[in-house]
């Protein structure tokens, strides 16, 4: 392995600067003269997406075959970090086989609002659960010599305007909700890299945010790896390098190199800043390349498919089972209805889309099972178009069966990178079908496919509801076995399912197209809000049924944790997920009514009992004191609550905890709405009290960060024309039921990304000329663009000639 210190002495400043940006869409720069290899980076979080031909960052072009595991949102329902580690190891093995050094995942965004179109890529609304699962994935991936790259750091909760939105969040909420998952992942998973998010956080882009990248990530958590930009996510490359950003991707060309050289010359940054970033990048390059050179070029596809199936089994959640309709008895005459039974929906759209090695089909698995499948009907148009003939045929088939298996869900474009959902509803034609089929045969099992929450006002029309989530390429076999009892579904929800979307604290303002995204609800996302506000939900966080039952007893507790006995009181084997929550009554702080602090899985045979221990760590009682600017503990009496869900608390013990807090964080500040959890409509005044400063102005500016979707604000006919064309194309794609992801990306893309995504064809100087044009300086802007274009071509050619020998 190369000695980084010696290598830094050999490299010229220009060569050093060149190494800090990519060469191609998914490749870093190599310098053979200095023995520095080029390495591959690749999506994705639940399956490798290495494109053999022309590469893109949106999943538009085909990739090499790989195993598609259940999405993070599905695996989270298993509450099994060890399973995550197994999946991670398989992902790492496939990445190594394809010579990929950095795998871009897992996703750790907090599920602030279920309309986020990319929720299927993320684990949970709870940072502790998300962090534990992510740490497992990271350990698994890196066990194969491949670097994991958890993402998107940080406070990135919507796809709308994702490259230029400013997340306005108070420091306590930032620390306790949006950073804790990353903290756990970094400290317990030790990732070699981490991906910064597109957005700003409190006025500064995440990728150049010293508070995030240096003070917290490196100084507090001890991270010593590489920070990699999201694709096209660099704003000020020099400031990013100074404040902790290591590698700019994908391929900004020579302009990025010249930006760093000019910054060193002007004193904006120093060569030691460049060296510090290379000291993070080069060990990753050499270590992963050496591991990959020794790795096999093949993997056991059958074994990985089997793992994907087991993961899908553990991730199934039984949400309803009226009259114990499930499991279905062998020989039962069943009608299979629904397009998803024949054409599976098993993954989301966008950069995580995998070209699966194989895909199981539920209808085929049911036909091969012990059930008597009397027929199949499509039942509904997948994309929502009403079809009376399909519905009529389905009802006729249902009337002949002992039971109906009805497969419902969201279609492919409903959940995607680059696009937020418009509502939580299933297509009306599916709901109409369910109601019609229920009139013909009430014994209905709904198998539901989605990557996130859906509203279920139709729940009374079915006797059983099995949530299959997005179960990956082997999910169909898991569902079939669960329906007949070969598998006992024991998963539990990793996010709250509300009665209606309007019940969610951020509902009124999501997903805003304003520049500022105001996190007015503070700590109260997911169950933290619903339990504090005592608001009813459809299915609570941590909820899930089973074909058996469990009893909890004999709890003992202290500051280190709890122990208790769990007994399988039913007639079949099963796995229980025991959850430990912490609550503090009469707190001097505002805080959620209860918070998850650990959990345990226990698998028991009928009648078997087991004593389990659940430990508490350094995060159990802490809060971020905004006045003292540190983690502290409020002393006093706490309740340790053990339950089968956040609402189904079985056992409780009180303990006394010694405090460390020396100053009240909100002394003389009236935050009554936060103490009561009344955060559905937080006033400007109350939010400013929480922030400790005025709410930033979100007014649109015509500058490098103006998005193409905001060109209607331009003072130029050219800008209006581009905006009009993009808007029309977007509207047409929506009306067709297939929004164009490429157009959506462009619509939400800031002008500066033109210089970051075009492999050097467009420079930032050319972007500045375009900005002048849009500001109304038409002739000067055009002259600037032409001048900068010529200059860019000449300078790029000169630089590449110098670097070619490197």
Feature locations, PLM:
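Glycoside hydrolase catalytic-domain context in secreted enzymes
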Residues: 1-619, 623, 637-641, 646, ...
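Charged, amphipathic alpha-helical linkers/stalks
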Residues: 646, 653-723
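A broadly tuned "polar low-complexity/structure-edge" signature
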Residues: 40, 71, 247, 357-360, ...
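Terminal connector regions
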Residues: 618-665
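Extended non-globular C-terminal regions
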Residues: 721-806
């Amino acid at each position: 392995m190369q000695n980084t210190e010696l290598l830094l002495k050999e490299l010229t400043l220009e060569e050093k600067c060149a190494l800090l940006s990519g060469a191609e869409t998914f490749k870093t720069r190599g310098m053979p003269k200095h023995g520095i290899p080029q390495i591959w980076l690749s999506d994705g979080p639940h399956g490798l997406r290495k494109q053999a031909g022309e590469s893109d960052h949106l999943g538009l072009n085909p990739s090499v075959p790989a195993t598609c595991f259940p999405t993070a949102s599905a695996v989270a329902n298993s509450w099994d970090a060890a399973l995550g580690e197994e999946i991670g190891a398989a992902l790492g093995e496939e990445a190594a086989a394809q010579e990929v050094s950095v795998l871009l995942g897992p996703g750790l965004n907090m599920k602030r609002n279920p309309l986020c179109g990319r929720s299927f890529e993320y684990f949970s609304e709870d940072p502790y659960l998300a962090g534990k699962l992510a740490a497992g994935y990271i350990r698994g991936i890196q066990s194969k010599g491949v670097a994991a790259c958890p993402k998107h750091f940080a406070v990135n909760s919507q796809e709308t305007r994702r490259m230029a939105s400013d997340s306005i969040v108070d420091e306590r909420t930032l620390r306790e909700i949006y950073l804790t998952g990353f903290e756990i992942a970094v400290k317990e998973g030790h990732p070699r890299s981490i991906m910064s998010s597109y957005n700003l956080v409190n006025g500064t882009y995440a990728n150049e945010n010293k508070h995030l990248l240096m003070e917290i990530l490196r100084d507090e958590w001890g991270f010593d790896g590489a920070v990699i930009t999201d694709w096209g996510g660099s704003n000020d490359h020099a400031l990013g390098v100074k404040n902790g950003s290591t590698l700019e991707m994908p391929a900004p060309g020579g302009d990025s190199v010249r930006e760093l050289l000019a910054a060193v010359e002007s004193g904006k940054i120093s060569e030691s800043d460049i060296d510090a970033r290379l000291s993070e990048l080069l060990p990753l390059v050499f270590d992963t390349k050496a591991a990959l050179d020794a790795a096999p070029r093949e993997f056991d596809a059958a074994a990985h498919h089997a793992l994907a199936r087991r993961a899908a089994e553990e991730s199934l959640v039984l949400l309803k089972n009226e009259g114990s309709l499930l499991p279905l008895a062998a020989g039962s005459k069943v009608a299979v209805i629904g397009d998803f039974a024949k054409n599976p929906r098993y993954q989301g759209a966008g950069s995580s889309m995998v070209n699966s090695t194989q895909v199981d089909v539920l209808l085929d698995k049911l036909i091969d099972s012990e059930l008597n499948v009397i027929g199949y009907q499509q039942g509904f148009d997948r994309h929502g178009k009403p079809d009376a003939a399909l519905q009529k045929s389905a009802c006729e088939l249902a009337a002949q069966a002992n039971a109906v298996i009805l497969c419902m869900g969201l279609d492919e474009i409903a959940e995607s990178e680059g696009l937020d959902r418009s509502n939580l509803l299933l297509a009306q034609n599916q709901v109409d079908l369910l109601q019609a089929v229920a009139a013909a045969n009430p014994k209905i099992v709904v198998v539901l496919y989605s990557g996130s929450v859906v509203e279920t006002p139709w729940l009374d029309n079915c006797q059983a509801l099995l949530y299959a989530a997005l179960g990956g390429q082997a999910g169909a076999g898991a569902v079939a076995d669960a329906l007949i009892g070969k598998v006992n579904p024991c998963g539990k929800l990793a996010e709250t399912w509300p009665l209606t979307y309007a019940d969610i604290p951020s509902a009124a303002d999501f997903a805003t197209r304003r520049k500022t995204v105001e996190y007015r609800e503070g700590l109260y996302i997911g169950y933290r809000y619903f339990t504090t506000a005592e608001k009813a939900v459809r299915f609570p966080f941590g909820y899930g049924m089973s074909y058996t039952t469990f009893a909890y007893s004999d709890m003992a507790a202290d500051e280190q944790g709890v122990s208790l006995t769990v007994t399988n009181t039913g007639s079949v084997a099963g796995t229980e997920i025991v959850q430990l929550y912490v609550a503090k009554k009469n707190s001097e702080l505002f805080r959620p009514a209860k918070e998850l602090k650990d959990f345990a899985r226990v698998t028991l045979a009928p009648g078997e009992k087991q004593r389990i221990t659940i430990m508490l760590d350094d995060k159990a009682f802490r809060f971020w004191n905004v006045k003292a600017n540190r983690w502290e503990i409020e002393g006093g009496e706490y309740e340790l609550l053990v339950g089968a869900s956040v609402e189904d608390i079985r056992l409780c013990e009180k303990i006394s905890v010694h405090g460390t807090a020396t100053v009240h964080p909100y002394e003389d500040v009236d935050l009554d709405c936060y103490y009561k959890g009344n955060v559905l409509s937080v006033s400007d005044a109350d939010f400013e009290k929480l922030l400790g400063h005025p709410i930033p102005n979100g007014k649109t500016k015509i500058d490098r960060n103006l998005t193409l979707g905001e060109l209607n604000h331009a003072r130029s006919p050219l800008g209006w024309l581009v905006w009009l064309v993009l808007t029309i194309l977007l509207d047409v794609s929506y009306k067709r039921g297939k929004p164009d992801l490429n157009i959506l990306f462009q619509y939400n893309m800031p002008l500066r990304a033109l210089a970051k995504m075009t492999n050097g064809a467009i420079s930032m100087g050319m972007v500045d000329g375009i900005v002048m044009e849009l500001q109304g300086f038409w002739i000067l802007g055009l002259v600037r663009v032409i001048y900068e274009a010529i200059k860019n071509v000449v300078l790029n050619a000169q630089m590449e000639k110098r670097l070619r020998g490197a």
